[in-house]
Amino acid sequence: MRRNITRTLFVITCLATFTVSMVSTTQAQCSNATAVGVYGFTTTGSIIVPSGPVPVVAVGRITFTSAGTVFGSQTRSVGGSTAVERLAGTFSITPNCTGTIIAQVFVSGALVRTSTLATIWVDSGRKARAVFKKTVLPDSTILPTVITTEADRLF
């Protein structure tokens, strides 16, 4: 009887260890579907100009679609000057939950810049973090930036 209990406990322990090790090595897979939804976001950082860094902040709302497009709007302040901007672009997400957003930004219908962001999607796609990799003005001038964004899914 004692031998059967010991053997049963040994088998249960082995199965539990195997199951836990299988679960811990399985990684979540992401895709564009991970991000589909509406997010609220904040952006903070600086634009680097010859006279020194200029602070940038923004809050907004952005929608990610199943077709890999993004659109939304934000209110931003650059050095204390505010504007309401419209965003439109594309996004892609890799299986390791990193990705890219390329967004054109418009004020009163006029293109004011195109930004490329590197992203990471966390908490099963409920949150995202991003850093601006490149910002290009309509005349092809590259604007140096140190800007990050945090987004939370609204629905």
What are these regions (language model features)?
Residues M1-I12:
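Bacterial N-terminal signal peptides that target proteins for export
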Residues T25-F155:
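Mature soluble binding/inhibitory domains
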